[in-house]
Amino acid sequence: MMRHEYFVILVVMTAAWMQAAMPTDAETNLVTTSFWRFEGRLSAEFESAYLSSSGTLCDTRPTALQNLDWAVHFGDYGKLYGYGCFLSMMHDKQHELHRPAFNEFEGGAFYGYDWRLTDDVTFFNGAGGVWNPLFGYRNGYDDTLWEFRYFQSLENPYLTPYWDTLTLIEPGQWTRLRFGVRRDFALTDALTLSAWVDGVWGDKRRYKARYGEEPEYQFLYGAFCTSTAGLQLTWRFAERWLAYAKARQFDTLDRRGRRAEKRKTDYWARRDIAIFTLGVAYEF
């Protein structure tokens, strides 16, 4: 059994135990009367290509992901939240870089706070760290990635603007920023359509990490620019179960970056690509 399968089994057992141990509404009168509240979500999905959180297109072949998202709310004191994700490439086309059964784990922990401006508008802030151990690599690069992330969004029923920054701390250093807007549309009680568009900008160190060369010119000291537009249809087919389908269009915006991708011989060196995702999730 692979490591990610053990992880999924452990997560499911832990979630079941916590759900059973959690007091019910009848036992507490109201859940909101307790100081803290726990919630989580388990999901499994298949993607036609893999786009990393750094804004980099890492693979253009099918990928499987298993995710655990969790949050502990402390009333007016904010929340602790995070995630754990196992990623597996469903092929061995990059075996010269990774072991044939390629499995990668990424996890993060954050603190977030909602500042309620009106009944409908909330200003969210979140910050924390990401841990990405690169175990099992064949090329001798078994180091661990440490990243810092910071989030802000203006949550509202109309059009939510958001931005976040991701900074690689170790090994090496680079920074990327993402700015975007999103909106959810309730089609029925069970169906929700989500739409978003965002752009990613990276400094010259991020540019060099992707393309292996210095940028020819520097806009705000960098030239790594990409964009993603997406649609997701979510179906709540049971009280705690969701199924979803997602389509995204990824584009490289920087002209020199597009030329650098074109010169590459790697099969995953694509300047633009449509990415499709199918998934199922359980909330607890």
What is the meaning of each model-derived region?
Residues E39-S43, K79-Y83, T122-G126, Y158-Y162, ...:
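Residue-level detector of the transmembrane beta-barrel scaffold of outer-membrane proteins
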Residues A195, S227-F284:
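Predominantly the C-terminal beta-signal and adjacent terminal strand-loop region
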Residues S43-L51, C85-M89, G112-D114, G128-L134, ...:
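Outer-membrane beta-barrel pore domains and translocons
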Residues Y81-G180, K264-D266:
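Outer-membrane pore/translocation modules
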Residues V72-D76, Y113-D119, S153-Y158, F185-D189, ...:
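Outer-membrane beta-barrel strand-turn architecture
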Residues A21-Q94, A281-E283:
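Short glycine/proline- and aromatic-enriched beta-strand/turn motifs that initiate or cap beta-hairpins
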Residues A44-F46, Q66-V72, A109-Y113, G129, ...:
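Residues on the lipid-exposed face of transmembrane beta-strands in outer-membrane beta-barrel proteins
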Residues Y141-Y221, C225-T228, Q232-W235:
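Detector for outer-membrane/organellar transmembrane beta-barrel domains
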